[in-house]
Amino acid sequence: MNRVINFLNMVALSAMRRSELVGAFFVIAIVFMMITPLPTGLIDVLIAVNICISCLLIMLAMHLPRPLAFSTFPAVLLLTTMFRLALSVSTTRLILLNQDAGHIVEAFGQFVVGGNLAVGLVIFLILTVVNFLVITKGSERVAEVGARFTLDAMPGKQMSIDSDLRANLITVHEARKRRAELNKESQLFGAMDGAMKFVNGDAIASLIIVAINMIGGISIGVLQHNMAAGDALQLYTVLTIGDGLIAQIPALLISVTSGMIITRVPNTEAGVEANIGREIAEQITSQPKAWIIASVAMLGFAALPGMPTGVFITIAIICGAGGLLQLQRAKPKADEQRTAAVAPEMNGKEDLRTFSPSRQFVLQFHPGQDSAQIEALVSEIRKRRNRLVVQYGLTLPSFIIEHVDDIAPDEFRFTVYDVPMLKATFTQSHVAVEARQLEGENLPAAIPGNTDRQEDQWVWLPAEQSGELNPVSSTTLIIERMERALQSCAPQFIGLQETKAILSWLESEQPELAQEMQRVLTLTRFSAVLQRLASECVPLRAIRVIAETLIEHCQHERDTNVLTDYVRIALKSQIYHQYCGAEGLQVWLVTPESEGLLRDGLRQTQTETFFALSNETSQMLVQQLHIAFPVRAPEQAVLLVAQDLRSPLRTLLREEFYHVPVLSFAEISNAAKVKVMGRFDLEDDLEPLDNEHAA
């Protein structure tokens, strides 16, 4: 026995290694079946193989996680149709020549006829009509519509893949994989549309073969074999019905298989691909109320006169019990969901053993807040986030929306890695007004803003008292502060993983440039430069310019800040365009005496250069910055300083004056149009100017 098993294993392995030869042999054998007479014993074997293949295919279709898992099905469908037609030709030849087509054909015919030719013929015709008009026609129509819709949806899906790739949501490898799957899906549904024509033609050919067998067989029996008409009718009808059934039953199974594959809608919401049987069971049992209503309906049918009461009551009990059982099963799930709403460390149901990472972006609201207002605010915040991603080439996480009880009913909170980054007030009755607009005003109803630094310049007023003070609604203020918060935390999300994704994109578009860059620059230094650029709101989209600049300077310069300055100079056109207004670039300068004070306060360590200014100088600088760079300025202005002061000055202003761009003279081209707004004088008051100068 072991020798037989080992021999079969060797044959199977050899067939798998030479699968192309096996396929070619199978096709040639089908052709020879149509022209060469076969013995009845071999016909029985081939009929059994045909039925087995049909059963195997329908079971395979039920366990497929998605249609693409059986992308060769159109070719298999063509081969099985050819095999079935060749088998019908062989059995027809045996019926007409020998009045014998093997044991399986005769057994099928005798079983269905059951002593009554008319009943057997009617049953056979019903099976044929069901296969041809219902299953085959329906599958053909679904294949046609599926192919059309798949082709129509291809451009949108391709654009979605390209958009995800540009936003660094997926890698280049993942994008190629998705494009390949999309192409494979379109080819599958297109091939299925054509393959269903074979199934339709096979059903029509089966009807014609049945008519030929019956009419030709009776004629041959009466005219050539001198049989009585009744005997010929009995013999050839049984054989014809048997032959038709051994063709129609596999055809019916394969038609159902085609319909199941075409109509398959994979459900991957949970991230696990399930077979169709499991999905049907889960979805049917997902609504317990439907089972209970069906049970009541069955009881109604049982009450009708003349109905089999016991049958309907039994079915009603089964449906009702199923519905109640599902309700009991759904209750623990609801409890688990309510428990899951509580922090895992507070539910007291289990000992936590898994690693729980910090959540990146969380928007927190009070449960009692207006859902419509929350939805509108979140939508606008998402628009600002997406604009930053597109405009600056950033990789920002998605938002998690959470309702918590530990904040006031009129508050909003934004956390980054579970650390509060922004806290603001939701209010309809008050509006925000800049504090400098209230100088000299006596408004006792004014409420100071939050202690967050960006909101030190704001106070809250009742809406009816705002008058002509240019008030801002709480929603608008939250959105503006959220945009600044997103910009300030963007460098945290340009780590090694995100930098590797950018480098992978560069490898696909500029392979030589990417190879040279990896040779001269480590991934860590590249990431550090990108973080510095993002911290100063410099767009990262011109990645080719950034890469070429780093390749040019990184071998003789080790300081990341200096490398960043080189990149900024290379991106001077992008930076100028970013801050340029209708009248050109509005700049504030620093007087030479003030530059001297700043240079005197420079201190340098092995890792950084920073300012150590006196209290008087720091207060004067902060005071003049508040005047020159209000948070809600009509046009964006920049602070223009010498190259050696730019980086440490930007670091000094990073916390309180994040919205103030600091540029160096080297980052302004000779053709740039510059309007000087005034000069910072750290020994005197701010000096506003009205003159225009071209740099």
Curated annotation (Swiss-Prot):
Gene3D superfamilies: FHIPEP family, domain 1, FHIPEP family, domain 3, FHIPEP family, domain 4. Involved in the secretion of harpin-pss; a proteinaceous elicitor of the hypersensitivity response in plants. Belongs to the FHIPEP (flagella/HR/invasion proteins export pore) family. Keywords: Cell inner membrane, Cell membrane, Hypersensitive response elicitation, Membrane, Protein transport, Transmembrane, Transmembrane helix, Transport. NCBIfam families: hrcV (TIGR01399). It is a multi-pass membrane protein. It is found in: Cell inner membrane. One of its GO terms (biological process) is protein secretion. It comes from Pseudomonas syringae pv. syringae. This is Hypersensitivity response secretion protein HrpI. GO terms for cellular component: plasma membrane. It comes from the Bacteria. The chain crosses the membrane at residues 21-38, 45-61, 68-92, 111-135, 203-223, 244-262, 311-327.
